[in-house]
Amino acid sequence: MNAHEDGRLSRRRLLQAALLGALARTRVAHAQEFPTRPVKLIVPQPPGGAADRLARIFAQALEARWKQSVVVENKPGGGVVIGTLATARAAPDGHTFALLGSSLSINAAQRKDLPYDAARDLGPIARVGYFTVVLVAPADFGADNVRELIAMARKNPGTLSFASNGIGTSAQLAGEMLNHMAGIQLQHVPYNGAAKMYTDMIGKQIPLGFSVASSAESFIRSGQLKVLGVTSKERSPLYPQWPAIAETLPGFEAVNWAGFAAPAGMPRAVTARLADDILAVLATADVAKAMADMGIEVRPQGPDEFQAFIQSEMRRFAEISRPLNKPSN
């Protein structure tokens, strides 16, 4: 290479470096200016539920932080597919993001009819925590813990069943994971919500159920139901008296998480700004108390850690799921 060519190459490298530097400064500037207009927070569930309440807590706090309105838009239907698709199709500029949950991972593992690719079309922002999910039984059920339940199920294969609040929920996956890891055959009975499930359990129509602790708590306190274990990998700080199923089956974890995601392709600086602000809100005493009152454990994760968590969930759930292969109603 002669001196002229070497000089020309050096100028190209300098120009490339200058362009990259300008691009980086532009992205940082965009993140600092964000948001420049009202922000839409999509919730793929109907108004009034736990996800809707949680979204509105964060929307109010972020609105005060940004001095911009944050509008919660409920888009239920299709087993959260409608709201998730609307998020995936939005402009990746940070002005539309969503509060999603375990159904994102479960649908990706179970369903073949999704109009989006959860791993490719969405960008995780931050996980905020998860609902404590419990395995409950009627007070006079013949097992008082998971170890005794496994022994009972092995002695009487295929005779015990567990209830959940529906197909494709974290409660169903918790039961299927228990089957998978313990080598037992509990039959799944899906319910349309938890109210009828509790009635049937108390009435001895079904012996076991997985549910969110906060919704079962009144029945547990009254002595009508008892807790055999929680589905998180360790005891819940909200309910430390209840053992984790993982104490009997190491590695067991099937949580009903809550976190925020945006359309894929969002500038990393904007993702970082969103994550920083969401996690800052999460760290405030008022929000932490509101989440505890809802039975949600604070378990924060930033974008990279959250993405790795979702991918790990998809792999684990794919191992144990029976594909639905049909659209949700």
Descriptions of predicted regions:
Residues 30-120, 159-161, 184-212, 300, ...:
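N-terminal (or domain-start) structured segment
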